[in-house]
A protein has these predicted regions:
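RNA pseudouridine synthases
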Residues: 1-192
């Protein structure tokens, strides 16, 4: 009923029957009230809440066409970020932060692009970290080496859709669902 970026893990809504999905799809904004993600980012994210209003769009001049960029003529995007805690893992980066992101709008690569543009790229993000160097290597038929994975900090990007708030027509109150079944690299880091 909704989507996640290709390399993003976490909660996703499915309907058992096509007819149910079609009916709910029309009213998704009234059913799926809030979506929250956890991201491990490079850098010391500021305390408190950070609101990011940054329009995004693809750049036809970018050799990686699918990457989103901050452009004044882009689609309006709004993400609310909040520091959960700073992390200590010098083998990945001198400073890391666990950040909660709430999508207010839902655009392609919104969280990844916003964090990268703000100077806090997501650990393991092949597309937005180091100007897409690792994404390009894979796109050209190459494979990532152990050294590449070490530089990225993880085998997978550390972005996880961990919580949704839903309101179905037959419920009196909205309900919240959470998952903490993180990918192995992320689970190991968060357990430390």
């Amino acid at each position: 009923m909704h989507r996640l970026d290709r390399d993003t893990g976490g909660l996703i809504l499915f309907a058992r029957y096509g007819e149910t999905a079609a009916r709910f799809q029309k009213n998704l904004d009234r059913i799926l009230l809030r979506k929250f993600y956890l991201a491990v980012v490079r850098g010391k994210f500021p305390e408190g809440e950070v609101e990011c209003h940054m329009p995004l769009r693809e750049d036809p001049e970018d050799p990686i066409r699918l990457r989103m960029h901050h452009r004044v003529d882009g689609k309006e995007c709004f993400t609310r970020f909040k520091l959960v805690r700073h992390l200590d893992c010098p083998e990945i980066a001198p400073e890391l932060s666990l950040v909660e992101a709430e999508l207010i709008t839902g655009r392609k690569h919104q969280i990844r692009a916003h964090l990268a543009e703000m100077g806090y790229p997501i650990v393991g993000d092949r597309l937005y970290y180091r100007d897409g160097e690792f994404y390009q290597k894979l796109a050209q038929g190459g494979e990532l080496t152990d050294e590449d994975i070490k530089v990225l900090g993880a085998h997978n990007q550390m972005l996880f859709a961990y919580k949704v708030e839903l309101q179905l027509p037959y419920w009196k109150e909205p309900r919240t669902f959470e998952s903490h079944a993180y990918p192995a690299d992320m689970a190991k880091l968060l357990a430390e």
